[in-house]
């Protein structure tokens, strides 16, 4: 006779309760680098390059201006699309993070 071992589960496995607190990270919305200043500097450099240098140097300098201008435009679009910067509740929670409306719950 062959003996078989049967497994009896008396209670389902229970996940331990996590003691971690929920952390909410919000972007400040402030650029780390002032892109407008960089664009202005690049325009001055491009004008100087066109006045003094070859057409290739001039083209490269204006390409740099174009890239920086595009970065400024993309940054503005991202700020407009960022809910944390335009939502009044987010502004309220920044000033009063302990308010009931600002609590964050984990599942």
UniProtKB/Swiss-Prot annotation:
GO terms for biological process: negative regulation of reductive pentose-phosphate cycle; positive regulation of protein-containing complex assembly; reductive pentose-phosphate cycle. Contains two disulfide bonds; only the oxidized protein, with two disulfide bonds, is active in complex formation. It comes from the Eukaryota. Its main location: plastid. Residues 1-27 form a transit peptide. It is found in: Plastid, Chloroplast. Disulfide bonds join 50-58, 93-102. The keyword Transit peptide applies. GO terms for molecular function: copper ion binding; enzyme binding; nickel cation binding. One of its GO terms (cellular component) is supramolecular complex. InterPro entries: CP12-like, CP12_dom. The keyword Membrane does not apply. SMART domains: CP12. Keywords: Calvin cycle, Chloroplast, Copper, Disulfide bond, Nickel, Plastid, Transit peptide. Belongs to the CP12 family. Acts as a linker essential in the assembly of a core complex of PRK/GAPDH. Coordinates the reversible inactivation of chloroplast enzymes GAPDH and PRK during darkness in photosynthetic tissues. Monomer. Component of a complex that contains two dimers of PRK, two tetramers of GAPDH and CP12. CP12 associates with GAPDH, causing its conformation to change. This GAPDH/CP12 complex binds PRK to form a half-complex (one unit). This unit probably dimerizes due partially to interactions between the enzymes of each unit. Binds copper and nickel ions. Copper ions catalyze the oxidation of reduced thiol groups and thus promote formation of the disulfide bonds required for linker activity. This is Calvin cycle protein CP12, chloroplastic. It comes from Chlamydomonas reinhardtii. The gene is CP12.
